[in-house]
């Protein structure tokens, strides 16, 4: 009879299984048990059922409590079972062997109920079960106790494994507690996302921008500083372009900025090639707008434009020397608007300087020959007037070039002033005393060298003319201080000096000196003045640097009796068209 094993087998059974076990054990007890004892057994079964219910409730409570509370409740359940065994020991039919046989099923049902109990309660329960007194002392019951004792050791081992599963359940309960804490952790983990959505979702862009502006990052501050600096630079460039009192010093200081170098490098390099330094041009209305746009582009372009300016300047110089014999009415209109704008700004153009110097010279020499005066081309034949394509190109480049223009020396009046403005170029240069002094010194040195080199060629024709040319090259007239110096290409300066050194074959010395005083020592790109080449005996030959003049320019020039008596047989209008070759390299 292996009752504990059967009890261990039926351990996971329900209450109905316990009733079946008790009913199965009842036929064995029928010949020995009375009805009273059976009633007591049923009462014990009821107590076991109550203990099962109580144990189930304790299991439910233990899931909500810590491990120590569950151990205490299990200990209480074990003490209740021990009390039940004591009641069974004090029952009236306990001396019979049937009662001893009844106890293993009852204990088996109790062990079934108390399966998740710890080892301590199990040991107490087994001790209470093994300490039951045996009043009959029969060998059979003693043998059963021995077998039950041996089986109880095996039962304890199996119950230890069951207790390990109970500890696993306790761990699961602990994990459930941790799961609750994990829910809090997950809530803490999820809540920042929800807060971010709540904060930034309904927030308007204006509030976001306000937050960024109130608390800017370092990168934002750096970007703001660079933007402010660029805006300040652009405003400074606009002030430099639009200021009426622009000097060479202001131009040099402004040229240190990156955007301004694009427009002024061309002027500096062009003037440096001809010894003309520090003269900056006033821009026309359209070219000033283009220059502002190009300066804004140069903010982003940067150093690349500065590298390209050298190549562009040399190319434009060669193109300009080849295009000087083309003219257009639109270019003259633009030049007249530029002259009006420069007059409003209070700047003096080279024509005004020439007209003022011409008025002073007319006081000394009241009448001059027509062909001894400098020819000022009309707007339609001016070499300074450009074609529309080249004008648009120059406006795009927006580089202030020192372009020269020569006006007629006719009597000053409203009509002549208007015609002077029509003969102006698109860009009129501004001058300063410092630049004029520097140019005067450099030009006087070149004139001295050139006149000394050509002295032998001038002596056979007219010694007086050569001496007067040396006097003019050594001692400068007041016109050198007043007339603006123009930027020349190297070929232009050489041709101008070559023709300047040639004297008239036969002319009065005083007349020659007077007409040399009228001459301005500079010319533009080889357009020299051959007014010196007059002869009473010989016929006027077309000079290399002579610019063909239209009849309108000849009607402007005053014709005096002295000019008629000098024997000029061929007017300058019939000159050949080969004057454009002077500007070619």
Swiss-Prot record:
GO BP terms in the entry: cytoplasmic microtubule organization; microtubule nucleation; positive regulation of microtubule polymerization
- What are the protein's UniProt keywords? Coiled coil
Q: Where is this region: Disordered?
A: 1-34, 55-125, 324-365, 402-476, 492-585
In this chain, composition skew of type Low complexity spans 327-345
Entry annotated with the keyword RNA-binding: no
> What does the sequence similarity comment in the record state about its family?
Belongs to the SLAIN motif-containing family.
Q: Which domain of life is it from?
A: Eukaryota
Positions with biased composition (Polar residues): 68-83, 425-434, 441-476, 549-563
Protein's UniProt keywords contain Coiled coil:
yes
Compositional bias ranges of the Basic and acidic residues kind? 575-585
Q: What is this protein called?
A: SLAIN motif-containing protein-like
Pfam families for this protein: SLAIN
For bias type Acidic residues, the affected ranges are: 351-365
């Amino acid at each position: 009879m292996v009752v504990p094993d059967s009890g261990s087998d039926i351990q996971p059974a329900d209450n109905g299984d316990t009733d079946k076990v008790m009913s199965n054990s009842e036929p064995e007890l029928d010949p020995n048990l009375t009805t009273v004892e059976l009633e007591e057994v049923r009462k014990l079964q009821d107590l076991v059922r109550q203990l099962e219910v109580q144990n189930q409730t304790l299991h439910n409570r233990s899931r909500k409590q810590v491990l120590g509370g569950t151990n205490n409740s299990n200990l209480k359940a074990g003490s209740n079972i021990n009390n039940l065994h004591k009641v069974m020991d004090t029952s009236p039919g306990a001396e019979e062997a049937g009662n001893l046989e009844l106890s293993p099923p009852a204990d088996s049902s109790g062990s079934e109920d108390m399966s998740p109990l710890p080892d301590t309660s199990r040991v107490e329960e087994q001790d209470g079960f093994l300490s039951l007194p045996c009043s009959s002392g029969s060998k059979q019951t003693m043998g059963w106790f021995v077998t039950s004792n041996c089986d109880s050791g095996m039962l304890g081992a199996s119950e230890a494994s069951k207790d390990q599963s109970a500890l696993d359940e306790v761990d699961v309960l602990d994990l459930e507690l941790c799961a609750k804490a994990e829910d809090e952790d997950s809530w803490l983990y999820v809540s920042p996302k929800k807060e971010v959505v709540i904060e930034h979702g309904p927030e308007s862009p204006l509030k976001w921008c306000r937050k960024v502006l109130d608390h800017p990052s370092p990168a934002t501050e750096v970007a703001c500083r660079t933007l402010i600096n660029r805006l300040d630079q652009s405003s400074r460039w606009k002030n430099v372009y639009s200021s009426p009192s622009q000097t060479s010093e202001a131009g040099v200081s402004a040229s240190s900025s990156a955007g301004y170098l694009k427009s002024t490098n061309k002027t500096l390099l062009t003037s440096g090639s001809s010894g003309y330094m520090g003269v900056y041009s006033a821009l026309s209305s359209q070219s000033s707008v283009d220059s502002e746009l190009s300066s804004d582009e140069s903010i982003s372009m940067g150093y690349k434009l500065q590298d390209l300016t050298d190549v562009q300047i040399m190319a434009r110089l060669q193109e300009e020397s080849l295009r000087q014999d083309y003219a257009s009415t639109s270019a003259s209109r633009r030049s007249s608007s530029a002259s009006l704008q420069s007059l409003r700004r209070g700047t003096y153009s080279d024509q005004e300087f020439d007209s003022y110097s011409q008025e002073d010279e007319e006081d000394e020499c009241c009448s001059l020959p027509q062909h001894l005066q400098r020819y000022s081309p009309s707007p339609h034949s001016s070499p300074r007037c450009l074609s529309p394509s080249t004008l648009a190109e120059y406006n795009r480049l927006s580089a202030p070039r020192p372009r020269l223009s020569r006006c007629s020396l006719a009597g000053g009046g409203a009509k002549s002033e208007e015609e002077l403005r029509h003969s102006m170029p698109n860009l009129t240069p501004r001058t300063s005393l410092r630049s004029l002094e520097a140019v005067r010194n450099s030009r006087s040195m070149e004139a001295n060298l050139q006149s000394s080199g050509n002295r032998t060629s001038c002596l056979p024709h007219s010694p007086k003319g050569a001496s007067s040319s040396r006097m003019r090259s050594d001692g400068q007239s007041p016109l050198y201080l007043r007339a603006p110096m123009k930027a020349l290409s190297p070929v232009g300066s050489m041709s101008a000096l070559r023709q300047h050194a040639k004297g008239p074959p036969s002319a009065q010395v005083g007349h020659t000196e007077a007409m040399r005083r009228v001459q301005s020592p500079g010319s533009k790109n080889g357009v020299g003045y051959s007014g010196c080449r007059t002869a009473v005996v010989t016929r006027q030959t077309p000079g290399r640097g002579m610019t063909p003049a239209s009849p309108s320019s000849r009607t402007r020039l005053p014709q005096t009796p002295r000019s008629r008596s000098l024997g000029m047989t061929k007017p300058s209008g019939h000159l050949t068209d080969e004057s454009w070759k002077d500007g070619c390299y």
